[in-house]
A protein has these predicted regions:
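An aromatic- and histidine-rich active-site surface loop
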Residues: 46-49, 112-130
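Short internal beta-strands
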Residues: 37-43, 139, 179-184
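Structural motif
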Residues: 6, 110-111, 178
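A nucleotide-sugar donor-handling region in carbohydrate enzymes
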Residues: 147, 155-233
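Conserved nucleotide-sugar donor-binding subdomain of glycosyltransferases
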Residues: 74-120
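Active-site proximal beta-strand in glycosyltransferases
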Residues: 128-146
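A short, glycine/small-residue-rich beta-strand->loop->alpha-helix junction that serves as a flexible
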Residues: 11-23
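Conserved nucleotide-sugar phosphate-binding/catalytic loop shared by glycosyltransferases and other
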Residues: 4-5, 9-11, 32, 36-87
Length: 233
């Protein structure tokens, strides 16, 4: 099988957790396939560690909308209402899809990787964006839960879960695209997604490939517990 040489890597979602594992994935890609060329698309603050690592950021990254802003607006204390975040970020998602469409229409890539880039996955499944090369989506959870008894929130959660399951079916039923789940099957609740919707874990096992945990360090370095504890004082 021919190894893809030019990869567009879109580090999505919020905060720095995703880009940390994305850099770990990029390191392993280069280790196994030294000829790989990575071009990155991300927004602040994910652009900071990417620049520090010397990665190639596309110029369009300066215009890529920041998902962290609507996330902060949806947060209360130490928690965040995911549904409220999803509703607040629609404008940013539409903007990012427009930029993504411009990039793939001009750039020649062999594969596109998206780390929780829901806006791209949905737009591809709805054929709002045409992508001729394979698309790889990375998840670390599946399905939303309502955090209150508000019927509007419950309906919104159900609608989002329906869209998510439908997107997976459309995007992942063939041999072209792939979804990776950063974790184990047990990390997906063995519960229903909603009325007439699939069981979460069964759905994940059907459509996702589980990678185990992606770590930005080598666990073997910490195998000697006594030495590790002594170094920590």
């Amino acid at each position: 099988m021919e190894v893809p040489k030019k990869i567009l890597y879109v580090s999505g979602s919020i905060g720095l957790g995703h880009v940390t594992r994305d850099l770990a994935i990029a390191g392993q890609l280069r280790k196994q396939y030294p000829e790989v060329e990575l071009s990155w698309l991300a927004s602040h603050p994910a652009t900071i560690p990417l620049k520090e690592a010397g990665e190639k950021l596309l110029p369009q990254a300066d215009m890529y909308a920041n998902d962290s802003v609507p996330a902060e607006n949806a947060a209360r204390g130490f928690g965040m209402n995911i549904l409220k975040y999803a509703s607040k970020t629609r404008r940013e998602w539409a903007h990012n899809v427009k930029i993504f469409r411009q990039i793939i229409s001009k750039g020649k890539f062999d594969v596109v990787i998206g780390d929780e880039t829901y806006e791209i996955g949905i737009s591809l499944s709805m054929k709002l964006v045409r992508l001729k090369v394979p698309f790889v989506m990375i998840y670390d959870f599946f399905g939303l839960d309502s955090v209150t008894e508000n019927p509007i929130e419950k309906l919104g959660v159900y609608t989002w879960n329906w869209i998510w399951a439908k997107t997976d079916r459309k995007l992942l039923s063939g041999q072209k695209n792939l979804a990776l789940f950063a974790g184990e099957p047990e990390d997906v609740p063995d519960t229903g997604l909603g009325f007439f919707l699939p069981n979460r874990r069964d759905h994940a096992k059907t459509y996702y490939k589980f990678t185990g945990y992606i770590l930005p360090f080598d666990p073997a370095q910490y195998a000697d517990k006594t030495r590790f504890m002594s170094q920590g004082g």
